[in-house]
Amino acid sequence: MDDPIIQRIERFRCSRGALFAERRNRGYTLYRSQSAAPVARLRPAGPADSFEVLYWSLWKNRWASTGPFGRTVVSIDDALRFIAYEDIFWVMT
């Protein structure tokens, strides 16, 4: 598959470990390569390169918004940096 978003995700150098992604249900699910544990979910939002960033909520048992006041919508590059540095994404890994 030649999905440019998946290629960008898999090329991203994350200090916590390599990521791989798959396209699922109108978005992308990111996994840690070492454990295959889910790390984050990116859902397209608005302009071509904007994504809502979601994390797996152990309390709600579903993907949830990361922002304190609602959705976090950023470019793919900003989303990957956000995921790399925020601990909430790495709880299950």
Where are these regions (language model features)?
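Short, conserved beta-strand/beta-arch hydrophobic-aromatic motifs that form part
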Residues: R32-Y55
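Negatively charged, low-complexity tracts enriched in Asp/Glu with abundant Ser/Thr
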Residues: M1-S35
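Generic structural motif recognizing short loop/turn segments at the entrances and edges of beta-strands
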Residues: G17-L19, R26, D49-F51, Y85-I88
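Mixed-charge, Lys/Arg-enriched low-complexity segments
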Residues: M1-I9, Y55-T93
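Intrinsically disordered, low-complexity regions
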Residues: A18, Y28, P47, P68-R71
